[in-house]
Amino acid sequence: MHKSEDQLLCALGRLAELLQRIGHPRALEVADHLVGFRQAPGQMLRRLNGNDWWAGAGSLAAETMADNPGLPEALWCREIREFRELMIEIGEALQAEGAANPGISSWLLAFNNWNASEV
């Protein structure tokens, strides 16, 4: 397994935990991807590079802009920041593996800018 795949597995695990903590509807899907990655890494890399992760309003990346579901504001801000940081880690690992989804670069730029601005 490549270093980027190890990083990807670690980030996926942490993302699954975070999504579970905040009650996100895609938490189980991300956890399933983690299990699937161990069984069929090539297939999971293709899925993680897919539009449902990186393109448009329904993508997981876009979920980082979701409204607070009722958590204390300071907690929500920390969780969303971590969500973006994990998506950055996943996006960078995918790029290191040769991922070509055009949405990844745009989201990485946005996430880094938002985190730097403390948005």
Question: What is each stretch, according to the model?
Answer:
Residues 14, 24, 57-59, 92, ...:
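Intrinsically disordered, low-complexity regions
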Residues 19, 52-54, 87, 94:
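Compositionally biased, low-complexity repeat tracts
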